[in-house]
Amino acid sequence: MHLVNLLEPWILLRLAAGAVTVLLFARASLTSWRILRHFDVARHSEGQLALERRADLSAALVRVGTIVQIALLAFTMLAGDKLSASIRGAMCGYGVFHATPWGFRSLGATAGTAIAAGVVSELYSFDARVRSFDLARPLAIATLLLAPLSAIDLGLAAAFALNLDLSVVASCCSVQLDAVAAGVAGPEGLGASTRAFATTGAAVAIALAVILALLAARRPQRGIIVAAAGASLVAFPFAVAATVLEVAPHVFEVPQHVCPFCLLRPSVLGIGYPLFGAIMLAVICGLGTGIGALLSRTSAARSALTPFARERLRREAFAWIAAFVLAALPIARYAIVSGGASLFH
């Protein structure tokens, strides 16, 4: 255990921000617990009115916590990149997170919590348009899940920080990813098939997600909305895989360079931040709208779903289009400067 790591500004700020999200979601969860136990729209007592006001406070806390959690994800990636200068051999954030078994677990928990919080925040935005309290209990249950998720995230971040040895000689991404890169970079065999599958799958899945989102925005029916959400969820892993296997090599013009952390470096204008951000925004909007459609079982909720779905699904489509354009730019640039030559031949 390396308590001295707590003196590192990047680590200290990361843990402090994580504690803020835990407190925000924990406070919102207290109200959610009271709602599950005592909320009854048929009652008109002072206690019921107080619960309704507290529900609005809970929504505000979740929204603020979501903003902090998403910013925390970006900050975690940035902190990993900055800490790479303190570890010999680590050329980017990959070497930092790989230096301890807790690194990627912590990063995964931060990303998962950010997406979950984003979806719940979308549901609160939908609930604000519903002229009834039909979603009070489902939202209370969803909010109760955010507190333990953020606590797990903070615990893993603390384990990562306290087990990180800044005095070791770490391996850079090119060394750790050589086995993968050697296969993927080749023009033939399993590696090339994996890259082609990821790239083609991403293009098809994103196109399908955009088409379904625009169709659902034009005609907001539950079935189409849920299908658009499902397409967005399917496109997510394909988009991430294609970013690593196809986009990253073209950014650096090196076929075996498949490190997503290097896409966050200033030397490539930090293209990874808007690219991954657009993918994340599309998934959050899609899932939030899809779950909202599934929860719309009353006339009040269905009436509010139409304008909400139109707005959010257009945002989802534009986010996927932005991600596709950002991913295509390095590939198009390489095709121009190389005279149309393939990077992988």
Placement of each model-derived feature along the sequence:
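Polytopic transmembrane helical bundles with strong interfacial aromatic enrichment
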Residues: M1-V247, E253-H345
